């Protein structure tokens, strides 16, 4: 029987040199290990990432309290449970914590245990994790959102918006789409170098040059697509996809530059302009009418529900509008958004909610209500590639896991190559079909 007989956590370092939690789960015949990511721009409604707060050790970012919670309370409570009973394990974790935001034991403690149990269960069952979670119908490789230009909280530059991404949609296989992304990444690097701009990279592996404006950033990406020999799509207002090979996705992370007192969006890093919610929605409408944009994540601030409604009414029929800080992988927040008719997609970050079961329920709720799901990394990552497995397990169709540099990002892309190889002829790359706009 695959009975849990030991759970052990340790403090390791993530891709930014900050502590995070890694968990090992042992049964008599299987083993699972998982490392927990962390974010730079975090939503106020996210589950609590428990940090030690001792400024003299890792600047207060240690996670030894969370580690201790795993090695004592959680280890004792879960010993003897069947590692294959994922829902029961996750329910027990939630019961042990007993708070709505995981603030007692820490979402970082709970998630590490939840994911490691799933991996141990998969090993016991003799299955890949994606097959163990998703069953026989798990066969869809995700279209990647590749973060090639960084700004906002992810980079020390003059760009307000956090991520400018490319999405290779006009391909029949994941491996061809990945090659396209890599070639555009290198074309962009050469383009920046030719203009005397920095090719240093941000937290997620994208370039972080100092540019004159936010518009210059997206125009550089469009130019790089062409330089690499690929065809960008038309603006959303002009038919959008057509024979496009590549489209652009944005994550402005608008909560980061929303002034809650002024109720204005303040472009703090560039021209200092201040926009109302209606003006911000119109700003994005203008961009959608000008550039080949297929997706905008967090185009409005996390609690600006009225602004989100305006944006959805303006461009929600032709642009994927992804809620990250808005929904925080939380089924209750997503249900509220569905009821209010805001957005049409949810970003899925496992550490925003804290357990695998809750993550899968959020994805299911989205699917049942016609919302797409984008499986996502965090800016503070590790070599753990679980999200690649989850993307295929759920047939989500889209993944957001950084640029074509930094091993913490490439580990996910490379894991998807292995999954594609394992699936063989069963592998599906959805391309344009990943979108419902």
Swiss-Prot record:
Pathway: Carbohydrate degradation; glycolysis; pyruvate from D-glyceraldehyde 3-phosphate: step 4/5
GO biological process: glycolytic process
GO molecular function: magnesium ion binding; phosphopyruvate hydratase activity
Domain of life: Bacteria
UniProt-annotated binding residues for Mg(2+): 251, 297, 324
One Pfam family matching this protein: Enolase_C
EC identifiers of the protein: 4.2.1.11
Entry-linked PROSITE patterns: ENOLASE (PS00164)
Keywords, sorted A to Z: Cytoplasm, Glycolysis, Lyase, Magnesium, Metal-binding, Secreted
Protein name (record): Enolase
Organism whose genome encodes this protein: Chlorobium luteolum (strain DSM 273 / BCRC 81028 / 2530) (Pelodictyon luteolum)
């Amino acid at each position: 029987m695959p009975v849990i007989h030991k759970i052990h956590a340790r403090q390791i370092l993530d891709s930014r040199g900050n502590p995070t939690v890694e968990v090992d789960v042992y049964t008599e015949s299987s083993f699972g290990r998982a490392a927990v990511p962390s974010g730079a721009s975090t939503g106020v409604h996210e589950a609590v990432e428990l940090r030690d707060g001792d400024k003299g050790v890792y600047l207060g970012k240690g996670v030894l309290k969370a580690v201790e919670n795993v090695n004592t309370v959680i280890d004792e409570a879960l010993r003897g449970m069947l590692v294959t009973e994922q829902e029961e394990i996750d329910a027990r974790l939630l019961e042990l914590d007993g708070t709505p935001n995981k603030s007692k034991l820490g979402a970082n403690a709970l998630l590490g245990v939840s994911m490691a149990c799933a991996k141990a269960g998969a090993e016991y069952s003799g299955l890949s994790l994606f097959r163990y979670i998703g069953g026989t119908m798990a066969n869809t490789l995700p279209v990647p959102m590749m973060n090639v230009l960084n700004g906002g909280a992810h980079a020390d530059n003059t760009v307000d918006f956090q991520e400018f991404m490319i999405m290779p949609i006009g391909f029949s296989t994941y491996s061809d789409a990945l090659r396209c992304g890599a070639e555009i990444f290198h074309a962009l690097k050469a383009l920046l170098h030719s203009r005397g701009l920095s090719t240093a990279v941000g937290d997620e592996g994208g370039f972080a040059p100092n540019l004159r404006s936010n518009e210059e950033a997206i125009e550089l990406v469009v130019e790089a697509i062409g330089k690499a020999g690929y065809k960008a799509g038309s603006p959303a207002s002009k038919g959008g996809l057509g024979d496009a090979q590549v489209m652009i996705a944005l994550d402005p992370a608008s909560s980061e530059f929303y002034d809650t007192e002024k109720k204005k969006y303040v472009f703090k890093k560039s021209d200092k302009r201040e926009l109302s919610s209606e003006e911000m929605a119109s700003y994005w409408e203008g961009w959608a009418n000008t550039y080949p944009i297929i997706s905008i994540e967090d185009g409005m601030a996390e609690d600006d529900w009225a602004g989100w409604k305006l944006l959805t009414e303006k461009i929600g029929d032709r642009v994927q509008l992804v809620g990250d800080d808005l929904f925080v992988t939380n089924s209750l927040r997503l249900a509220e958004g569905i009821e209010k008719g805001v957005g049409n997609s949810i970003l899925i970050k496992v550490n925003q909610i804290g357990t695998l079961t809750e993550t899968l329920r959020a994805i299911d709720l989205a699917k049942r209500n016609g919302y797409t799901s984008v499986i996502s990394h965090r800016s503070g990552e590790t070599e753990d590639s679980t999200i690649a497995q989850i993307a295929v397990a759920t047939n989500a169709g889209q993944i957001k896991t950084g640029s074509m540099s930094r091993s913490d990002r490439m580990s996910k892309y490379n894991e998807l190559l292995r999954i594609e190889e394992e699936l063989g002829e069963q592998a599906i790359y959805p391309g344009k079909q990943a979108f419902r706009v």
